[in-house]
Structure formats: structure tokens, C-alpha cells
A protein has these predicted regions:
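Long, helix-rich interaction regions
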Residues: 1-167
């Protein structure tokens, strides 16, 4: 595989992973409002959030294959740990890295504000959120074992074990 082909592969995979991170984070946000009432709902939300975070991390590793590692890691660290003003500068740098389509998705995902509102600006660029039943069916076929476990758990009797208000 030559350098041009590997860059194309990295770019394509980065877009795909960014879209998946968006889907999982958005679906977790939607399922979290109102607060999950059962352990299986809570586990599903946690599995989606975890998957989104892993996809996001993978996007940054893929960007390192397209850009200077030091720059990408610096942007990633600022986005994870800095306050709003510095984060906005890092988002600006991120928007100019790698594949514009992928980094635009990442910038929108990492910006401050309501995730559902931000998703509306990306209509057509990321798949719309799935209904819970469809989501569970599709996650059951996932290669991610945590998503599969969460999907199988979500199929069990809903409301069977309500979370106590003390938690």
C-alpha cells in the first residue's frame, strides 16, 4: 500500500469513526433525557458514551497518520483538559487538520452547548438518531462487546429493576 492509498484509507476511516462517535454520543444524550430509570437503560447509555469516546480517540490517532503527531496530541490534550477559551483555540486548529469533513464533525462534536441542537446543523452529514428498538437491534450485531452486552440487557423486561432514587 503506497502513501497516497494509506492517507485515503486513514481519511475514510476517520470520517466513518467521527460519524459513529456522533451517532453514539447523540443517542446517549437522547436516551439520557429523561434520566434512565432502569439499570439496563443506564448501561446502554454508558456503553454508547464509552463507544463514542473510543471512536473519538481513534479519530485523533488516525489524524496523527495525516498530520504531525505533536500537533494532534497537543490539540487533543487541550480539548480534554482546558477551559473554554483555550478549547475554542484548539477547535480552530483542529478544523484545519487532516480531512476537513472528519474534522468538521469532530469540531461540532467537541464544541460547547446542547448536543441535540448542534446535531441539527449536521443533517445529512451524520445519520439521524435511531429509535431505541432499532438501536438495540443494530447494536446487538456490533463488533463492540460492550454495545452487544448493553443491547442484550436492554432487550430484557423494561422497568424490571427500577433504579432507586437514592443512587
Amino acid at each position: 500500500i503506497n502513501e497516497e492509498d494509506s492517507k485515503e484509507l486513514f481519511a475514510s476511516e476517520c470520517i466513518s469513526r467521527a460519524q459513529r462517535a456522533w451517532c453514539h454520543r447523540l443517542e446517549a444524550a437522547i436516551l439520557s433525557n429523561p434520566k434512565p430509570k432502569t439499570m439496563s437503560e443506564r448501561f446502554l447509555v454508558m456503553a454508547l458514551e464509552d463507544s463514542a469516546e473510543r471512536e473519538l480517540t481513534t479519530c485523533f490517532r488516525l489524524l496523527e497518520g495525516l498530520e504531525q503527531t505533536k500537533v494532534v496530541r497537543s490539540v487533543e490534550n487541550v480539548l480534554r483538559f482546558a477551559h473554554a477559551r483555550i478549547r475554542s483555540d484548539a477547535l480552530e486548529v483542529l478544523s484545519n487538520l487532516g480531512v476537513r469533513e472528519a474534522t468538521a464533525l469532530l469540531v461540532h462534536l467537541l464544541e460547547e452547548g446542547d448536543l441535540v441542537e448542534r446535531a441539527q446543523a449536521l443533517t445529512g452529514k451524520v445519520p439521524p438518531p435511531r429509535e431505541q428498538e432499532t438501536l438495540v437491534d443494530e447494536l446487538d450485531a456490533s463488533e463492540d462487546r460492550w454495545l452487544v452486552l448493553a443491547a442484550r440487557r436492554a432487550r430484557q423486561e423494561p422497568g424490571r429493576e427500577e433504579i432507586s432514587s437514592e443512587e
